[in-house]
Amino acid sequence: MRHFFKTTLYAIGFMSITLSNPSFAAKTETYNQLNLFADVFERIRANYVKDVDDEELIEAAINGMLTSLDPHSTYLNTKRYENMRVQTSGEFGGLGIEVTMDKGVILVVAPMDDTPAFHAGVKAGDYITKIDGEQINGLTLNEAVDKMRGKVDTDIDITIVREGESDVIELTITRAIIEVQSVRHRIEDEIGYVRISSFTEKTTSGLRDALKEIDEELGDNLQGIVLDLRNNPGGLLDQAVDVSSTFLDRGEIVSTRTRNDKNIQRYNAKPGDNIDKKSLVVLINGGSASASEIVAGALQDHERAVVVGTQSFGKGSVQTVMPLSTNGAMSLTTAYYFTPSGNSIQNEGIVPDVVVEQLRLNDSEAIRARRSEASLRGSLANPNATDEGDDEGDDEGEEDD
């Protein structure tokens, strides 16, 4: 009886400590949930009808945890992490499309210029539903991208659903080494035209080389520059900052803000406008995302450029790639982008100063033009909104293939 009494007092005392210490209670609940995970893991290993690989189970659990947050947080195993590092260097193998997951299938954000997918006729807003005859449903984004990659000069069959088209589109595309020449230029009369298709490590140097060649050819006859960011899915933040700085003398280009505005980082222009304040027009459309929107937003807010086209994609979140102990990494959404005027790009995009609809051959083009970050299930709400509502995350981030 005395032992029971002591035990009861101990239990009551433990409960009192727990109730009076919310953080302790929260930690206890977290540990209980981790124990639940371990319990499920062991039951699968012991009782599942087929043999399972421990590493694959854990990787699937990590993927599920990250992809439940928003469409852009994802796990990168060793192979995918290495692929990502190769992609940002500006040369990799694949088809040449920027993709994300939407409603269980692959959504094409934009095809990259002069790549196999581009020449095959893949368009922004297309849904890829099958790869080599296999349904995409049930695959993660990473698994689907892995299937699209392969040896150079081998063929892949993809099935595309294009809204506005009654029939599915079957394409056979030959894989190639994708050497992304992210900057191209030409001269039309006395106007310099510069096309940036993505933001890789070589983009800023490519832009400045292009401007130098234009200046050498036109000299004082140069009337202005057209900077084409249409169907540019984005890329490296530092390159977006440097490209913006190329046309600005001073001022903020973009700021990033973490949870509860605990950490605000501002990126400012360096002195020197490479085209001496000559006229600048920036072209955008619904395929202009992320880094493209940073450039367009900065030049628009500083009234340095006239932005022309249609509303951009609206991806205003920052993904930080965090290396893990397994030689893999996770890409985690850690902050929002804000333009110099304090506006968030998230789900809103950049609204052009002059709206010019692209030439469309049919209604499907109009439907594709409306594809945006906000249309993705699980997209994060705009932090400038007074009522953010609930986010329901069940899709994954973007990848190049």
Name each model-derived stretch.
Residues Y31, R184-D401:
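C-terminal "post-core" interaction segments
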Residues R2-I225, N231-P233, E392-D401:
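Flexible, low-complexity junctional segments that flank or bridge functional domains
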